[in-house]
């Protein structure tokens, strides 16, 4: 009996297992069909995406090819423009050499007054006597009014019209620095201040030695009694005027012949701030022009704009002070020409420097009637720009390169 029951159970289990297997196989087949359908869809989508990607790639390659052609065309146009500008600069230089500026001849004011007095005396005599002044005994007509012209030293009335040439002399020292001549003397010596803080000045006998020398071995070294700060120093009439590195920004007058301090002064300027937005190491910039020494500075009281002061080179006293409309922001350097402050601006990512603000102490010119003057493109940003009034050139330090800029001047009357 037990054996019969066992056989019945075995048959029943076998039947159930067969049914489950059939159901399972049917389920598996259904899932496989779904997967095959999805794989087919993915394959179609992949083919479509691959085609779109291929088309996009071809479009990008075509655009890059066109961009490269345009770039090459622009480069050729730029080269042609540079050639034309160079040719134009040479022609302008040639015209300037062929047509030198005429000498300035003026009649002395005292002689003019004497001329007027004699003329009035003559008219009065003729009115009283009724006869011409030439009939006066012992008096000749040629004694009257024939006053020869007297050549006088012309007053400074020039303004910058353009930068006509740029000369790169060499690369020396740090990215910031200063190089200059004696701006009031007749010496050919070149004075080099390497860095924005140091105590040693390098002196080369002439421009040739400075240009050809690859080191400071041929230079004489002057060790100053106090270190300097910034690049706002100047050599003027045998003396070095430099800013001492301390909290008061003391101006030191140092005689280069006997290597001694002649005088020193703390300028009457309170709460100083960097005068140039792109040259944070400069708090005071001493410059020179045809009229003497000037100080360019900035204070917290007028922290947005640059200030200007006239400096007495003998006593280091301030003669007069001005607040200018020239902003500090994006200014990299400045200089004075004929009593006018020219501020040079740039961008934080260095581009072409430009004179974009002019302040004249006499009020005869302003930024509105002076065109923007651009400097040729160069390496970085100017850490110093020193105007030489005798040469009409700017000695510039550009990211470690020593450069000369030649200026073209014109009379202020030509602006109006």
UniProtKB/Swiss-Prot annotation:
Annotated ranges, domain Olfactomedin-like: 155-411
* Keyword Heme assigned: no
Query: Which compartments does it reside in?
Result: Secreted
PROSITE patterns, sorted: OLF
Q: Which residues are glycosylated?
A: 198, 258
* Disulfide pairings: 156-338
Coiled coil (residue ranges): 48-129
Similarity-based family = Belongs to the OLFML3 family.
Q: What is this protein called?
A: Olfactomedin-like protein 3
The record lists the organism as Xenopus tropicalis
């Amino acid at each position: 009996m037990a054996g019969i029951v066992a056989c019945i159970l075995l048959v029943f289990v076998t039947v159930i297992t067969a049914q489950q297997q059939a159901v399972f196989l049917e389920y598996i087949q259904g899932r496989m069909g779904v997967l095959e359908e999805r794989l087919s869809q993915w394959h179609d989508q992949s083919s479509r995406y691959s085609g779109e990607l291929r088309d996009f790639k071809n479009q990008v390659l075509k655009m890059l090819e066109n961009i490269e052609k345009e770039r090459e065309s622009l480069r050729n146009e730029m080269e042609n423009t540079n050639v034309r500008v160079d040719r134009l600069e040479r022609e302008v230089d040639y015209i300037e050499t062929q047509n030198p500026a005429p000498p300035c001849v003026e009649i002395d004011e005292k002689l003019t007054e004497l001329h007027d007095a004699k003329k009035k005396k003559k008219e009065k005599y003729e009115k009283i006597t009724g006869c011409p002044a030439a009939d006066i005994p012992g008096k000749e007509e040629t004694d009257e009014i024939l006053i020869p012209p007297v050549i006088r030293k012309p007053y400074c009335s020039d303004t910058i019209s353009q930068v006509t040439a740029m000369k790169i002399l060499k690369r020396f020292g740090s990215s910031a620095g200063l190089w200059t001549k004696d701006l009031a003397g007749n010496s050919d010596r070149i004075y080099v201040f390497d860095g924005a803080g140091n105590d040693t000045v390098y002196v080369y006998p002439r421009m040739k030695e400075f240009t050809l020398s690859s080191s400071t071995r041929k230079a004489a070294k002057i060790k100053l009694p106090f270190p300097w700060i910034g690049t706002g120093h100047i050599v003027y009439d045998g003396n070095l005027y430099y800013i001492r590195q301390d909290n008061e920004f003391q101006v030191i007058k140092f005689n280069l012949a006997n290597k001694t301090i002649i005088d020193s002064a703390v300028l009457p300027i309170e709460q100083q701030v960097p005068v140039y937005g792109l040259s944070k190491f400069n708090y005071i910039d001493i410059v020179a022009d045809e009229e003497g020494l000037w100080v360019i500075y900035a204070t917290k009281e007028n922290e947005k704009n640059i200030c200007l002061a006239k400096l007495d080179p003998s006593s280091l006293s301030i003669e007069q002070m001005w607040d200018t409309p020239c902003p500090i922001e994006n200014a990299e350097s400045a200089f004075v020409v004929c009593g006018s402050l020219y501020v040079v601006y740039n961008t934080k990512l260095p581009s072409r420097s430009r004179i974009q603000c002019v302040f004249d102490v006499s009020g005869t010119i302003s930024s509105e009637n002076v065109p923007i003057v651009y400097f040729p493109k160069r390496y970085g940003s100017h850490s110093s720009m020193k105007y030489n009034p005798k040469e009409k050139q700017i000695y510039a330090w550009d990211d470690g390169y020593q450069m000369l800029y030649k200026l073209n001047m014109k009379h202020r009357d030509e602006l109006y």
